[in-house]
Amino acid sequence: MGAVLGVFSLASWVPCLCGGASCLLCSCCPNSKNSTLTRLIYAFILFLGTIVCCIMFHEGMETQLKKIPGFCDEGLSTRITDIMDKECDVLVRYKAVYRISFALAVFFFAFSLLMLNVKTSKDPRAAIHNGFWFFKIAAIVGVMVGSFYIPGGHFNTAWFVIGMVGAAFFILIQLVLLVDFAHSWNESWVNRMEEGNPKCWYAALLSVTSLFYILSIIFAGLLYTYYTKPDGCTENKFFISFNLILCVVISVLSIHPKIQEHQPRSGLLQSSLITLYTMYLTWSAMSNEPDRSCNPGLLSIITHMTSSTLAPANTTAPAPTPAVPLQSGPSLNKENFIGLLVFVLSLSYSSIRNSSNSQVSKLTLSGSDSVILRDTAANGASDEEDGRPRRAVDNEREGVQYNYSMFHLMLCSASLYIMMTLTNWYSPDANFQSMTSKWPAVWVKISSSWVCLLLYVWTLVAPLVLTNRDFS
């Protein structure tokens, strides 16, 4: 009898997989809004896909992947530039990451098209977006399995180009999220400073701003020390110097009287955070430079700095040398983990904030600046305490809280960003017989840093240019 009751109890959860599946999280997050939980579930799916991609780099996976018919037939003798001859055991991991990311990107791009112009949860397509999770996960798995049977060659080269464009787009989205976060942070602290205890909050604001600028200066100094030479690395010298000049310009611009007049909440906190992010993008670009003498690798730099600290005063620590890859093939390095950390923070923040109409409008800079963290506040009808799974509150009957299509497009670009990050932005040839770090990847990243700075400048000057719009 108990077993029968247990079966019926489990059966009550079936609608969560085939209908509005947000009830899967409602037991942990009671009275939560449907708009928030749906985004969290999609983000969790992408996180799972990222974990699967990371597993593909585990030593020994190539043995299993080579069992897939035709998946490794192309690899006879391969070579990673400036490293050593490799077998197909090495590149098969890159190909696996390409296929998994392809499945995720195709799924999210298809949903981006499907969810165009959804206005309320009454739209039948909204039910697909907010539910039917079992079928959507099954679809992703099906596309993943099928993608491993796609012939290589031109697919690999074309997908690399698409991945590079999509990853660059996600870098810009990260900047938009960063600007939004910095503005919200600054506004919150300024409001508290005006409400009471101004000296304390002013000191906190000044301390954090100073910390970001100090870290940026240290970052730039390390880049000059390890990524340039007195008689070489001209491109790196230009990248660092030019971006430093631009960061100084935006910092001065953010406190210009004209800017302050039209946008009083702009300030150095936002500029300091953007400066630090720009230094990160500069380093990320130079870490893909093909010339290994100008790109020593993060592990080599850390080793050199550690040996310099621990070495006796009368000895000199050896200069950093280009890192030698593991004999077993490609693996996740320090650069990968830093890129993944930035990705996780960006996606987590966007899942609860960026995707509202007011926040997605920041992608077009339309000026609305409401906060949607209140979506998680408890209100609406109380859940029945009858043992049935809790249901999320549908807060989108009168209008969606975020742009469904834009959210899926962001996840699509995030999938491509993960693909490029895990594969170190290496470029395959037409037959996937070589993986090389090339200059196009460097220029895509460094150009993204310039576009990011340009976007931030636009957020500052937009109130001066578009005087008929409300940016308050």
From Swiss-Prot:
One of its GO terms (biological process) is antiviral innate immune response. Restriction factor required to restrict infectivity of gammaretroviruses: acts by inhibiting an early step of viral infection. Impairs the penetration of the viral particle into the cytoplasm. Non-ATP-dependent, non-specific lipid transporter for phosphatidylserine, phosphatidylcholine, and phosphatidylethanolamine. Functions as a scramblase that flips lipids in both directions across the membrane. Phospholipid scrambling results in gammaretroviral surface exposure of phosphatidylserine and loss of membrane asymmetry, which leads to loss of infectivity. The gene is SERINC3. PANTHER family: SERINE INCORPORATOR (PTHR10383), SERINE INCORPORATOR 3 (PTHR10383:SF51). It catalyses: a 1,2-diacyl-sn-glycero-3-phospho-L-serine(in) = a 1,2-diacyl-sn-glycero-3-phospho-L-serine(out); a 1,2-diacyl-sn-glycero-3-phosphocholine(in) = a 1,2-diacyl-sn-glycero-3-phosphocholine(out); a 1,2-diacyl-sn-glycero-3-phosphoethanolamine(in) = a 1,2-diacyl-sn-glycero-3-phosphoethanolamine(out). Belongs to the TDE1 family. The modification Phosphoserine is found at residue 370. N-glycosylated. GO terms for cellular component: Golgi membrane; membrane; plasma membrane. Residues 1-95, 153-158, 224-238, 350-405, 467-472 are extracellular. The chain crosses the membrane at residues 96-116, 132-152, 159-179, 203-223, 239-259, 329-349, 406-426, 446-466. The keyword Cell membrane applies. The keyword Coiled coil does not apply. It holds the Pfam family Serinc. Signal peptide: none annotated. It is a multi-pass membrane protein. Keywords: Antiviral defense, Cell membrane, Glycoprotein, Golgi apparatus, Immunity, Innate immunity, Membrane, Phosphoprotein, Transmembrane, Transmembrane helix. Residues 117-131, 180-202, 260-328, 427-445 are cytoplasmic. One of its GO terms (molecular function) is phospholipid scramblase activity. This is Serine incorporator 3. Glycans are attached at residues 34, 354, 403. It is found in: Cell membrane; Golgi apparatus membrane. InterPro entries: TDE1/TMS (IPR005016).
